[in-house]
């Protein structure tokens, strides 16, 4: 009798670590993108919470008039925010070691840049992690492609827009009222509501919500019953079953009769592709619009009113929007400049006589 002895190969610590990182058997997949994502998102989240609760006021406009954003300095959940980095810093990289003291770093809004940069790296890695897990499982990569839409939108407001405007102080504040303030100022300075790409984004978000609600309600209403009337329909479902759980033809027939035949899908793949692509493309366009307006390539500006043959102004909706934009711009950074930039850009009259 011959005994066959096999030499057991001892794996190195690194090999075992690498196998654990890319294992799809873990409860939560880590992946190589996760190695960078986890510390970045933990850092961003921790600093955001601390700054939201306790950060001192920030000199956002760079004019020695600090703005309070934290809860301990008089704000509530609605008005609180992590205030953007000071205009005095501009686009300079501003880690803690660039400031003379921690107090100076806080005064100039260093936490905002720290949170935004780590958050940006984190969400990009999350998108890469989605692709990585799909690749390991032999799936197609479209989950990561869909997630690229919100990543593009976040990149536009936190990275591209400050770069285009020349300062991180123009980035979106990290808070509820700060977000609304950013939107109002953006409208005042760029007339975003009159930009076709923003209109496509609105159609994508609201249309996606409508289509999602329609699809969910149709599926829920056409479940295949495997039980009696006395028992819940859900009791007939087995997790992971191969059989269809709802009748797409019944849903197609219902919706076709409700509107018209070709308004509904009878192909499940086409239906779900449409549900995915509609909001994603809309948000892509919005991010593209934000990124172009960052460099002052603005929306459709109707700066000249329509006049009749007698020179009288024919009031239009564009006049109302223009007036609202000027009013919002007057109130924005009211201590930093006295007039809206649209009015202040006109050459001053000579005073030399």
From Swiss-Prot:
Its main location: plastid. It is an enzyme of class 1 (oxidoreductase). The record marks 161 as: Tyrosine radical intermediate. The record marks 344-345 as: Cleavage. InterPro entries: D1/D2, Photo_II_D1/D2_sf, Photo_RC_L/M, Photo_RC_L/M_CS, PSII_D1. It catalyses: 2 a plastoquinone + 4 hnu + 2 H2O = 2 a plastoquinol + O2. The chain crosses the membrane at residues 29-46, 118-133, 142-156, 197-218, 274-288. Pfam families: Photo_RC. The modification Phosphothreonine is found at residue 2. It is found in: Plastid, Chloroplast thylakoid membrane. The record marks 190 as: Stabilizes free radical intermediate. The keyword Calcium applies. A quinone binds at residues 215, 264-265. The keyword Manganese applies. [CaMn4O5] cluster binds at residues 170, 189, 332-333, 342, 344. CDD domains: Photosystem-II_D1. The modification N-acetylthreonine is found at residue 2. Fe cation binds at residues 215, 272. GO terms for molecular function: chlorophyll binding; electron transporter, transferring electrons within the cyclic electron transport pathway of photosynthesis activity; iron ion binding; oxidoreductase activity, acting on diphenols and related substances as donors, oxygen as acceptor; oxygen evolving activity. The D1/D2 heterodimer binds P680, chlorophylls that are the primary electron donor of PSII, and subsequent electron acceptors. It shares a non-heme iron and each subunit binds pheophytin, quinone, additional chlorophylls, carotenoids and lipids. D1 provides most of the ligands for the Mn4-Ca-O5 cluster of the oxygen-evolving complex (OEC). There is also a Cl(-1) ion associated with D1 and D2, which is required for oxygen evolution. The PSII complex binds additional chlorophylls, carotenoids and specific lipids. One of its GO terms (cellular component) is chloroplast thylakoid membrane. Belongs to the reaction center PufL/M/PsbA/D family. Photosystem II (PSII) is a light-driven water:plastoquinone oxidoreductase that uses light energy to abstract electrons from H(2)O, generating O(2) and a proton gradient subsequently used for ATP formation. It consists of a core antenna complex that captures photons, and an electron transfer chain that converts photonic excitation into a charge separation. The D1/D2 (PsbA/PsbD) reaction center heterodimer binds P680, the primary electron donor of PSII as well as several subsequent electron acceptors. This is Photosystem II protein D1. It comes from Stigeoclonium helveticum.
């Amino acid at each position: 009798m011959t005994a066959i002895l096999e030499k057991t190969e001892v794996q190195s610590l690194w090999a075992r670590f690498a196998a654990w990182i890319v294992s799809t058997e873990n409860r939560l997949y880590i992946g190589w993108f996760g190695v960078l994502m986890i510390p970045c998102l933990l850092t961003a989240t921790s600093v955001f919470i601390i700054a939201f609760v306790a950060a001192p006021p920030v000199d956002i406009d760079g004019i020695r008039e600090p703005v309070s954003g934290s809860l301990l300095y008089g704000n509530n959940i609605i008005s609180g925010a992590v205030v953007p980095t000071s205009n005095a810093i501009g686009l300079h990289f501003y880690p803690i070691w660039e400031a003379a003291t921690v107090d100076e770093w806080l005064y100039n809004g260093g936490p905002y840049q720290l949170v935004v940069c780590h958050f940006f790296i984190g969400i990009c890695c999350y998108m890469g992690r989605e692709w990585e897990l799909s690749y390991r499982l032999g799936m197609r990569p479209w989950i990561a492609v869909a997630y690229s839409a919100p990543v593009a939108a976040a990149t536009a407001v936190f990275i591209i827009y400050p770069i285009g405007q020349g300062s991180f102080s123009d980035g979106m504040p990290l808070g509820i009222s700060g977000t609304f303030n950013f939107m109002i100022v953006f409208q005042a300075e760029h007339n975003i509501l009159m930009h076709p790409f923003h209109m496509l984004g609105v159609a994508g978000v609201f249309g996606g919500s409508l289509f999602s609600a329609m699809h969910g309600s149709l599926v829920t209403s056409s479940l295949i019953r495997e039980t009696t009337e006395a028992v819940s329909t859900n009791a007939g479902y087995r997790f992971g079953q191969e059989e269809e759980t709802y009748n797409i033809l019944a849903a197609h027939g219902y919706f076709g009769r409700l509107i018209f035949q070709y308004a509904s899908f009878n192909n499940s793949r086409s239906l779900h592709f449409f549900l995915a692509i509609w909001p994603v493309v809309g948000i892509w366009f919005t991010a593209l619009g934000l990124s172009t307006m960052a460099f002052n390539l603005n929306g459709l500006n109707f700066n000249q009113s329509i006049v009749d043959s007698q020179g009288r102004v024919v009031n239009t909706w564009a006049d109302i929007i223009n007036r609202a934009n000027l009013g919002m711009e007057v109130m924005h950074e009211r201590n930093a400049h006295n007039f809206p930039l649209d009015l202040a850009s006109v050459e001053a009259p000579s005073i030399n006589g």
